[in-house]
Regions:
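Flexible, processing/modification-adjacent segments and terminal tails
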Residues: 27-31, 35, 84-134
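Post-signal peptide N-terminal segment of mature Sec-exported envelope proteins
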Residues: 28-56, 77-78
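C-terminal motif of bacterial Sec signal peptides marking the signal peptidase cleavage site
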Residues: 16-20
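Short, surface-exposed charged micro-motifs
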Residues: 49-52, 72-74, 135-139, 149
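Gly/Pro-enriched, hydrophobic low-complexity segments
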Residues: 61-66, 117-172
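An acidic-aromatic
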Residues: 53-110, 153-160
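Bacterial signal peptide processing site
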Residues: 22-25
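Bacterial N-terminal signal peptides that target proteins for export
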Residues: 1-9
Length: 172
């Protein structure tokens, strides 16, 4: 009888521990790193089509497809410098030399910010905040937490994210 009681007790503990596995908040936690997507961006007067990749380590790349004048350019950001790559050549700029209004810096500031609690709306899970004195609104899919759109009005930045998926390292 003692062994049965121990068995039942152990089973209850195991079930209790398993109930917590994989639990998510109802809105899904916002995913601001560790994802890749296609980004349709309106930045000032420029319309941009690019592939945005944010690694789990916090670095970011923006690979431009449009406008044609930027096609093939890849901007990288790791928090300490920005890299510009084109045709196998690469140039690194220290963070203090990168203008505050640079697209990659603006994206990195918003996606790298600590996000306060958001609000569920018809658009999705909306996170409003401020970084470097600029207000932003980041909309995430309520089920997955993956970004859907971003607005930074003061910078003239409006972005829509599609084909969004969790980041997979090429070496995996």
């Amino acid at each position: 009888m003692k062994y049965r009681l121990q068995y039942v007790f152990a089973l209850l503990i195991a079930l209790t521990l398993l109930c917590g596995c994989g639990a998510k908040s109802p809105a899904g936690d916002p995913v601001t790193e560790g994802f890749s997507c296609r980004a349709a961006i309106r930045y000032g007067e420029m319309d941009i089509d690019a592939r945005l990749t944010c690694t789990p380590e916090g670095s970011m790349t923006v690979a431009f497809a449009l406008p044609k004048s930027l096609s093939g350019v890849v901007l990288g950001w790791n928090g300490t410098d920005m890299t510009l790559e084109l045709g196998g050549m690469s140039l690194a700029l220290p963070v203090e030399k990168v203008p505050e209004s640079a697209l990659v810096r603006c994206l990195a500031q918003v996606l790298g910010a600590t996000h306060p609690t958001g609000t569920r709306t018809e658009e999705g899970y909306v996170i409003s905040g401020e970084t470097e004195g600029k207000a932003y609104a980041l909309v995430c899919d309520p089920a997955t937490g993956l970004p859907v759109s971003l607005s930074v009005p003061e910078e003239g930045l409006e972005a829509t994210f599609t084909e969004t998926q969790l980041y997979k390292n090429a070496t995996e």
